[in-house]
Regions:
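Active-site proximal beta-strand in glycosyltransferases
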Residues: 75-76, 92-138
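A conserved mid-protein helix/loop that constitutes part of the nucleotide-sugar donor-binding site
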Residues: 17-20, 220-234
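Short N-terminal targeting/anchoring amphipathic segment
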Residues: 11, 66-85, 97-103
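A charged, aromatic-enriched C-terminal amphipathic alpha-helix characteristic of glycosyltransferases
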Residues: 344-396
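Acidic donor-binding loop of glycosyltransferase active sites
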Residues: 284-297
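Conserved donor-binding/catalytic core segment of Leloir-type glycosyltransferases
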Residues: 203-223, 242-243, 365
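A short, active-site helix/loop in glycosyltransferases that binds the activated sugar's phosphate group
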Residues: 135-187
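Nucleotide-activated donor-binding/catalytic signature segment of Leloir-type glycosyltransferases, i.e.
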Residues: 257-276
Length: 396
């Protein structure tokens, strides 16, 4: 069989905003790719979005369409392995290569195995007033079992793992951490975005003269806002102000409590971003903050972090976050909130100097080099040809 035979790939994703990134990533010589965007809001949807893209509902109607379509492809990529995609894997034929393009939410939001490791002490205390979060995993299992009469998402995911050829992600440390709790498919390095996707052409620099401090990236409880607050109150310089993006987040009661806590302690020095901005407007908002704190204990908000580091913001992460160790391993200057923040407040060192900014820019360019995918692509191509040859030999 010729090594130049076209590889037919199909991509299943739930968020159309990532589609341009994925299409650019798979504009590969010798590959033909098709893309399916899952519609989780409507029923019985099947419509073309272009020559190589279609939108399909995530109900049984759409599931049957996708499973039938998979028969024509060599390899399938599943972006964020939710319940629908896991069930499609479980019901698909044995010859198809399945790759799980990891996001994070499909693990952290579907199981309580990490509950004791991703929340700070002050945030954990809030669970007593947030039953919708404290018992979220139990509620979801009951909902799927009693109401939908379907396996819970984590059950579907676990069953699909044996049929997945590889999990694709670029933070190996995170894969090692999760593997201690859940058996994962073999890991291979891959990133479905490039430098230009994260850092658009013409990106400006952070306003180093500003005294705005960014806290977190959303209204999700994994931001550990309550654990950041005590250290912010130690900043006596009233010229400093604090911005909390709270646009995204599932639990309105948590958001309300965080706003109340911050207002009570910081008064008019704190503002909350709750409205939706265009991407350009959001980037402009980020660049107003020469200091940023992301106290997640797990990978989250990585696009924000990389963008801010490149534009010149001094970023503080939790010492518990695998992203901190990953960035340091790759030579990027990032700081520990629990250790460095108060010292830097006292020494008035909450911003980066120009030399360190340039250093981070160079390292992030290296980190986001798309050519790092080449080894994994070659391995996937080899596996496709092995299976094609096996199928030909079986027929013969």
């Amino acid at each position: 069989m010729s090594a130049k035979e076209t590889i037919n790939s199909i991509h299943l994703l739930s968020d159309v905003k990532f589609l341009p990134w994925i299409k650019r990533t798979f504009a590969l010589q010798g590959w033909s790719s098709y893309y399916i965007v899952l519609n989780h809001k409507e029923k019985k949807v099947c419509k073309d979005l272009g020559d190589d893209t279609m939108e399909v509902s995530s109900d049984s109607f759409g599931e049957s369409i996708i499973i039938e379509k998979l028969r024509s492809y060599d390899i399938a990529f599943h972006y964020l392995l939710n319940n629908t995609k896991a069930e499609i894997i479980n019901k698909s034929g044995a010859d198809l290569i399945h790759c799980w393009c990891f996001y994070g939410a499909e693990i952290y939001q579907q199981t309580n195995l990490f509950r004791n490791t991703i929340y700070g002490p002050q945030t954990r205390k809030m669970f007593w007033t947030l039953p919708e979060k404290r018992f979220r995993y139990e509620f979801r299992q009951w909902y799927y079992f009693f109401w939908k009469r379907e396996p819970s998402p984590i059950s579907s995911l676990r069953r699909s793992i044996s049929k997945i050829y590889a999990i694709l992600w670029y933070v190996e440390e995170e894969m090692e951490m999760i593997s201690q709790k859940i058996k994962l498919p073999p890991w291979k390095f891959f990133q479905f975005f490039s430098f230009d996707d994260i850092i658009p052409a013409g990106t400006g620099n952070t306003d180093i003269r500003s005294k705005k401090i960014l806290i977190g990236n959303s209204a999700t409880i994994e931001n550990n806002h309550a654990d950041v607050l005590p250290l912010l109150t130690a900043i006596s310089d009233k010229e400093y102000s604090f911005s909390l993006p709270l646009t995204y987040g599932q639990f309105s009661r948590y958001k309300s409590q965080i706003k109340s806590k911050y207002k009570r302690k910081l008064g008019e020095r704190v503002t909350f971003l709750e409205g939706h901005l265009s991407l350009e407007e959001y980037y402009s908002f980020l660049r107003k903050h020469p200091t940023a704190v992301f106290l997640h204990y797990r990978q989250q908000g990585l696009g924000n972090i990389l963008y801010l580091l490149y534009t010149g913001t001094k970023v503080y992460l939790s010492q518990h976050n695998v992203v901190y160790r990953w960035l340091k391993k790759n030579g990027i200057e990032v700081f520990i909130f629990e250790v460095d923040f108060l010292r830097d407040v006292q020494e008035q060192q909450l911003t980066l100097d120009q030399k360190m900014i340039q250093h981070n820019q160079e390292k992030i360019r290296d980190l986001l080099d798309h050519q790092r995918n080449d080894i994994t692509i070659a391995e996937l191509e080899a596996e496709v040809y092995v299976r094609k040859n096996r199928k030909v030999n079986d027929i013969a």
